[in-house]
């Protein structure tokens, strides 16, 4: 199926690893020009070697001023994937100021800032656009030791709706994708314990975790004109977890 992404310019945050990296590869394979944003230079260097033509931008999105400087002259962007995120797991009674500050700066505030930069450019050019925010099933279900992470993703889901409301008149669609556990290298490592995995898998009707391509396919669909009437949604990629 042709998604009509050829010739469009996309920006992906958290592009060095996992879902972000795979999204960059898929977008370029679909004919898009891609700006890849990561805080880790080594990841960007290896991405450019694997995927020549990608435009790398190395910046820590937790730093507002550095992000403004790095992205203010990034050029026209038609498609945005806000994927960068951090997860600090702590019991509620042990949550620290540092965990709150870092998590909200990256998982929420950076989405606001990057989306503002990109959306202002779209509006100035008078062109339609699409934004996908990578959220989580944790936005809608409480998970032990995930106080801050769940809260940032809940905030991200509501941000998605407000962005859709305010940017819709400018023909800019905004949606979230909400995966379950995803089998990235980090996901495999974190859920390798059979007992821990079984507790979660027992809550998923399809009985399995998501593969990276399940999430990437959904992101590309939401970026494409195939979803031209979809905005303000939070689309689960969770095997039915949120239905239970």
From Swiss-Prot:
What is the primary gene name for this protein? Dcxr
Q: What does this protein do?
A: Catalyzes the NADPH-dependent reduction of several pentoses, tetroses, trioses, alpha-dicarbonyl compounds and L-xylulose. Participates in the uronate cycle of glucose metabolism. May play a role in the water absorption and cellular osmoregulation in the proximal renal tubules by producing xylitol, an osmolyte, thereby preventing osmolytic stress from occurring in the renal tubules.
The protein in question is named L-xylulose reductase
Q: Which residues carry this modification: Omega-N-methylarginine?
A: 21
Q: What CDD domains does its record include? A: XR_like_SDR_c
For substrate, which residues are the binding ones? 136
Quote the tissue specificity entry: Highly expressed in kidney and liver. Weakly or not expressed in brain, heart, lung, spleen, epididymis and testis.
User: What's one Pfam family the UniProt record gives for this protein?
Assistant: adh_short_C2
Q: Name one GO molecular function term.
A: oxidoreductase activity, acting on NAD(P)H, quinone or similar compound as acceptor
Residues with the modification N-acetylmethionine, per the entry, are 1
Q: Which SUPFAM superfamilies match?
A: NAD(P)-binding Rossmann-fold domains (SSF51735)
- Please state where this protein is localized: Membrane
Q: Spell out the reaction equation it catalyses.
A: xylitol + NADP(+) = L-xylulose + NADPH + H(+)
The record's listing under PANTHER family reads: D-ERYTHRULOSE REDUCTASE, L-XYLULOSE REDUCTASE
Q: Which residues bind NADP(+)?
A: 11-39
Give the source's domain of life in one word.
Answer: Eukaryota
Its source organism is Rattus norvegicus
């Amino acid at each position: 199926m042709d998604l009509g992404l050829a010739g469009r310019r996309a920006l992906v945050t958290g592009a060095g690893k996992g879902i972000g990296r795979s999204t960059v590869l898929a977008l370029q394979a679909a004919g898009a020009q891609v700006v890849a944003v990561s805080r880790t230079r080594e990841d960007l260097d290896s991405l450019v070697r694997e995927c020549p033509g990608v435009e790398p931008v190395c910046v820590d999105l937790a730093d507002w001023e550095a992000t403004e400087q790095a992205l203010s002259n990034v050029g026209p962007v038609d498609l945005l994937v806000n994927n960068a995120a951090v997860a600090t797991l702590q019991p509620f009674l042990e949550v620290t100021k540092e965990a709150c500050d870092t998590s909200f700066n990256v998982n929420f505030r950076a989405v606001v800032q990057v989306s503002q930069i990109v959306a202002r450019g779209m509006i100035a050019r008078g062109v339609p656009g699409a934004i996908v925010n990578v959220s989580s099933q944790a936005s809608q279900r409480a998970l032990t030791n995930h106080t801050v992470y769940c809260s940032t993703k809940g905030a991200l889901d509501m941000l998605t709706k407000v962005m859709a409301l305010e940017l819709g008149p400018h023909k800019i669609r905004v949606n979230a994708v909400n995966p379950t556990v995803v089998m990235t290298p980090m996901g495999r490592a974190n859920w390798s314990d059979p007992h821990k995995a079984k507790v979660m898998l027992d809550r998923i009707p399809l009985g399995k975790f998501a593969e990276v391509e399940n999430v990437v396919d959904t992101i590309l669909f939401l970026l494409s004109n195939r979803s031209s009437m979809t905005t303000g949604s939070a689309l689960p990629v969770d095997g039915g977890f949120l239905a239970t």
